[in-house]
């Protein structure tokens, strides 16, 4: 395997996943105890992967430490599936997630500078919960419009978004602008793990992951409800 992005080397394949055939199951938004507001140790996140086959993308607040710990533990266990090193970064305009990072990005930069730093690493940018009104850290429509040409992905399903229409607005925006969508539980407690995930074809790099998303299936459960397959849009 080459670096963190897995440009070389085999990818772990999941036979008989919910998308059929060989898929990788990814919960694209999970917080570990490396985020001060989360109660989930990395070892519990690892156990979810071992028991359910759902690999969490740990997006801790302003640090990559949680996803680095997960990558280390999976390496110790002999896994060759590439772990996505990620961080949910608080910018001056709102939160942005960097995926496939090789270096941690500091908070409190402008959104534009944060996006530059993400892309300078060959990484991908994801806007989480963009229309969620109970958070003060969502970018909103105006922020999305200003940054549209520099955004790679939009979070279309977030289990912690309480108003269903706000997830729908995110998916509608992504479709309007031609952006792939992701899905995540935004888990901060153990009970939330495994609520929402993507079933994607195997990938070995950020660009391969990006290209795999149109083929992904989404399994979504709002907090407290049963997971169910949904149409991407």
Task: Enumerate the language-model features and the residues they cover.
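Ser/Thr-glycine-rich phosphate-binding loops at phosphate-binding pockets of nucleotides
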Residues: 32-33, 56-63
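Short, conserved beta-strand segments within well-ordered enzyme catalytic domains
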Residues: 27, 56-58, 82-84
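Conserved beta-strand positions
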Residues: 58-61, 127, 156-159
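Short beta-strand/loop segments at the ligand-binding rim of alpha/beta enzyme cores
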Residues: 120-130
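Charged catalytic cores and adjacent phosphate/nucleic-acid-binding surfaces used
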Residues: 1-38, 42-47, 52, 68-71, ...
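Active-site substrate-binding loop(s) of clan PA
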Residues: 107-108, 120
